């Protein structure tokens, strides 16, 4: 297997291997809850129907949050310089000519990452923080953990702004699917850029 394809396969398998255990633990925890006490749509509120409203809500929120995220990124680069943050593997694959490697990396970034990260940050962390600290602090706290989890100093503030938008979308829509759509749009545009 060529180097870019080999590394794209490794990223896809590695991401799935890292995401599966916490999701299985979460499932076992949720299975033990009294179903009568759960909010409409379940604790994670994974209501897909109607899917077109999720697409609309996610797309609209993405359009609303994109200007402040881009502005924050521009200000960061203007005042502290380019701190990097771009994934070196992504650059290697994008500079290569293997369409399968590019496709596998796109699936990881645009489908798997938004599904997993929204389940963790907006599906679990946001409501847990909300119960302990209130809505405002839960929005900020989940956004901060989301930004820090990406391990990129140069992208910390733009990711914090993105996380704030995702958390507010989750609270306003009452569903996770619009957040996944918004996150996928963000990752997709970032991937293409």
Q: What residue ranges belong to the model's regions?
A:
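Hydrophobic core segments of transmembrane alpha-helices in multi-pass, intramembrane catalytic enzymes
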Residues: 18-19, 105-108, 158-166
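Transmembrane alpha-helix interface/packing and boundary motifs in multi-pass membrane proteins
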Residues: 108-115, 147-152
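Alpha-helical transmembrane segments of polytopic integral membrane proteins
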Residues: 22-27, 69-73, 113, 117, ...
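Membrane-interface helix/loop boundary segments of multi-pass membrane proteins
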Residues: 36, 53-54, 63, 67, ...
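Hydrophobic cores of alpha-helical transmembrane segments in multi-pass inner/ER membrane proteins
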Residues: 17-29, 176
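Functionally important transmembrane alpha-helices
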Residues: 132, 136-193
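Juxtamembrane helix-loop-helix connectors linking adjacent transmembrane helices
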Residues: 2-16, 30-113, 131
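Hydrophobic membrane-targeting alpha-helices
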Residues: 25-29, 67, 71-75, 148, ...
